[in-house]
UniProtKB/Swiss-Prot annotation:
Ranges for region Disordered: 1-35, 491-511, 597-620
GO biological process, one term: positive regulation of DNA-templated transcription
UniProt main location, coarse: nucleus
Domain called Bromo: residue spans: 124-230
Name of this chain's protein: Transcription factor GTE11
Location of region: Transcription activation domain: 445-620
Subcellular location: Nucleus
Pfam families per UniProt: BET, Bromodomain
Keywords assigned by UniProt, alphabetized: Activator, Bromodomain, Coiled coil, Nucleus, Phosphoprotein, Transcription, Transcription regulation
Keyword Transcription regulation on entry: yes
Protein species of origin: Arabidopsis thaliana
Domain (NET) ranges: 270-351
Modified residues (Phosphoserine): 417
């Protein structure tokens, strides 16, 4: 039996070896060299009596119970520190000052103090980073192909005997998780080194064209991207060692109850002062990504937020931003969720401004025959078509879902088909009566669309009637056959009538289009005509009328006026060149006025005397 004597709290075993059998004076007890300042005593069990054995068993049990209680108290104070399982007393790490070893080891033996290594101080930032490492490892192990790296490599099962020859330091994520849980890692850098070693071993042993190599490369990039985020957060924060770490450096030899209570209150006070940070779960993160992906157009607030939280390498262009939602911190994710919820609330307010349109089916009453929707007037002009007098748009009628395996589904189809049949029958009834003027007022495009909608729903109605007939199995087969034949005949007539209406509507639409084209052509011609009339004149056609007015003036002027003008006017006037004298200037130019009484003399002038021939232009 080997017994280590160390100075436990309170020196409760100071005289534990002073047994009646004389532990210190026993000639059979051999004392070995001291290890770590603790004397070691070897007791042969064969030389001990039964009473001495019982005494030793009782003493060792008491020491073991006290050791366990001490270990539990240290574990409560240091939750992140190394937790040592129940092993022999030689493997228990003790604080610095446990007191002096007081065991009497015989005459001439010197007493050595118990010296222990100083534990590394644990800071608040280190505790937070270790928690982040644990969450990152969980996310990494939940990836698609990560199961290949969760367990150690089995060289026998995989038939790779040379694995340990190539890989000197094997590692897997399962081992990393066990080390992280047991508190083996003293810093996050050790954790990241083991994770990188796992993927590096896989990429070293397997060729680059192997799937395991590609999976390891992908998971390594996944880890590195998220590890950089943790490093960025922890690099700027420097916190002093917490009170939990400083407690390990103090003497814990039988602490007084009052002091212990004071320390626990200080720890609780510090924990209350720290603000609780919100953490977004993986499900909420995936839901947020789906909600953002469903947006056809991102609002300005979300675009600015993503641009602020994205690095320059992630921006492929001015208008395109690529960002991984898993890279964002929890605070950023909650801010993004708040922006998205605010955007949805604004859209709901805009949609609620539209007035509700109640759509009721004809010949029916009850909640199943009306549909309430929020719509704007502009949408009704483009999409909705009125059929008949007081009919509502058929495009808002929900389609019938056929459920072959359930009776409730057939009943719903029958009710819906009856409602649609009453709608179309009401339309046909109104067309023959008072609704004829109303239908003529509709544009050809809407009438054509109404005919198409009627033709489309006719098959659904007739099929629903066939299903209704097939359900009545208890009725007379002859009656059912006759009703089916009548239904087929009605179906043919209905199709023929609807096709004729569609043709008429198409013809009316074509005529309306031709009239519209003709009207546009007339408008274009009229516009061209007005443009020609408004054009500026480039040539004056009546420019020579001024000369005629001047000649008229010369004709009517008398001799005195002409003489006065001649005396007063200058040579530049142009009148001096004419030697008119006192005669008519027109006659001077050879121009004569022909009067009616001179018509008789024209015959005499036609044959003049050859001897007295007058030159042309001469006045007699």
């Amino acid at each position: 039996m080997t017994v280590r004597n160390g100075g436990f709290p309170g020196d409760y075993n100071r005289n534990s070896f002073d047994s009646p059998g004389g532990c210190d004076d026993s000639p059979n007890a051999s004392k070995d060299d001291e290890t770590f300042g603790v004397p070691r005593i070897v007791l042969p069990l064969s030389d001990l009596s039964s009473s001495e054995r019982r005494k030793w068993i009782h003493t060792l049990r008491q020491e073991l119970e006290q050791l366990r209680s001490f270990q539990k108290s240290v574990g409560d104070l240091l939750p992140i520190s190394k937790i040592v399982t129940s092993t022999p007393a030689s493997n228990v790490s003790r604080p610095k000052s446990f007191g002096m070893s007081r065991c009497s080891t015989g005459p001439g033996k010197r007493v050595l103090p118990f010296t222990a290594t100083k534990p590394e101080p644990v800071t608040t930032s280190t505790m937070l980073r270790m928690k982040q490492c644990e969450s990152l490892l969980k996310r990494l192990m939940s990836q698609q192909h990560c199961w290949l790296f969760n367990t150690p490599v089995d060289v026998v099962k995989l038939n790779i005997p040379d694995y340990f020859t190539i890989i000197k330091h094997p590692m897997d994520l399962g081992t990393v998780k066990s080390k992280l849980t047991s508190g083996t890692y003293s810093s996050p850098s050790e954790f990241s080194a083991d994770v990188r070693l796992t993927f590096r071993n896989a990429m070293t042993y397997n060729p680059s064209d192997n799937n395991v190599y590609r999976f390891a490369d992908t998971l390594s990039k996944f880890f590195e991207v998220r590890w950089k985020t943790i490093e960025k957060k922890s690099s700027g924060t420097k916190s002093e060692p917490s009170n939990l770490a400083t407690l390990a450096h103090k003497d814990i030899a039988i602490p007084e109850p009052v002091a212990k209570k004071r320390k626990m209150n200080a720890v609780k006070r510090n924990s209350l002062l720290e603000p609780a940070k919100r953490v977004m779960t993986d499900e909420d993160r995936v839901k947020l990504g789906r909600d953002l992906g469903s947006l056809t157009e991102f609002p300005v607030q979300i675009i600015n937020f993503l641009r602020d939280h994205s690095s320059k390498e992630e921006r492929s262009g001015d208008d395109e931003i690529e960002i991984d939602i898993n890279d964002l911190s929890h605070d950023a994710l909650f801010q993004l969720r708040d922006l998205f919820d605010e955007f949805l609330r604004e859209n709901q307010k805009k949609d609620s401004n539209g007035e509700p349109c109640v759509l009721e089916l004809l010949h029916g009453s009850g909640p199943g025959n009306s549909l309430t929707q929020h719509c704007d007037g502009s949408e009704l002009e483009d999409e909705d078509v009125d059929i008949g007098n007081y009919e509502h748009p058929i495009s808002h009628i929900s389609t019938v879902r056929t459920e072959k395996d359930s009776v409730g589904g057939l009943n719903q189809m029958e009710d819906a088909s009856r409602g649609k049949l009453s709608l179309i029958e009401g339309a046909d009834g109104h067309q023959d009566g008072n609704s004829a003027p109303k239908e003529k007022e509709l544009p050809p495009e809407k009438r054509y669309r109404a005919a198409l909608l009627k033709n489309r729903f006719a098959d659904i109605i007739l099929k629903a009637q066939e299903i209704t007939l097939n359900q009545n199995e208890k009725r007379d087969p002859e009656t059912l056959q006759r009703e089916k034949e009548e239904l087929e005949l009605q179906k043919k007539k209905e199709k023929a009538r609807l096709q004729a209406e569609a043709k008429e509507a198409e013809e009316a639409r074509r005529k309306a289009e031709a009239q519209e084209a003709k009207r546009k052509l007339e408008l274009e011609r009229e516009a061209a005509r007005q443009a020609l009339l408004e054009m500026e004149k480039s040539v004056e056609i009546n420019e020579n009328t001024r000369f005629l007015k001047d000649l008229e003036l010369l004709k009517t002027v008398n001799t005195d006026q002409l003489r006065n003008l001649r005396d007063v006017g200058s040579e530049s006037d142009g009148l001096a060149v004419f030697g008119f004298g006192g005669s008519n200037p027109l006659e001077q130019l050879g121009l004569f006025m022909k009067h009616e009484e001179d018509e008789d003399e024209s015959d005499m002038l036609a044959f003049p005397d050859p001897g007295n021939e007058v030159e042309e232009g001469e006045i007699d």
